[in-house]
Amino acid sequence: MCRKNCHKFLIFCVFILGSSLIAVTGHARELKLLAFGDSLIAGYGLPKKDGFSDQLEATLNHAGIRLKVINAGVSGDTSAGGLSRIDWALGANPDAILLELGANDSLRGIDPAITKMNLQKILTKLQKIGVPILFAGMIAPPNMGKEYGLEFERVYLELAEANEVIFYRFFLEGVAGVPELNQEDGIHPNKEGVLKIVKKIAPFVIELLKRVKP
């Protein structure tokens, strides 16, 4: 019952914000958001309708915001993999972009300096096409050690400060490490976990859409 009511409340809140969005930007047309990332965007282990892209699109559509979320997530992708395919993904001509990458870099123990370099190259490409960017941060798992974790987190903080982006500090905020919100692997969110991510990131997505040029 709580989950159902919470979902209704979220849709209500987003509807109010969505009305403001249309009033401020005048966007009556359907906007295209490119969600570019790894398995967290792709919806690993879930039916398509339960993945992040579909749940985000459905939630905002129900709130009256005409939005198409393009799922450009690839399971297992690293920052290097993302850099190699970003030009192809931009062929979708999105109005705005959500960038979420790096989780697999940390799981593989890749040097944070390399992750930072790759993400900066991606951000530079995105800025060149002149669309607003929502940049989602990531935190390394505890087993990678405190020193690595701090260095990895600084990558996102420094990139957010150096680039013109909306910054969402941790994509898995409130979900990581919570068993009931994750699949059996303890890494990928389940349907309820994805909904919580959508609930938390929705205001940032709406702010992103407000910045889309008419």
Task: Set out the residue ranges of the language-model regions.
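Serine-esterase "nucleophile elbow" of acetyl-processing enzymes
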Residues: 27-75, 85-93
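Bacterial N-terminal signal peptides
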Residues: 11-21
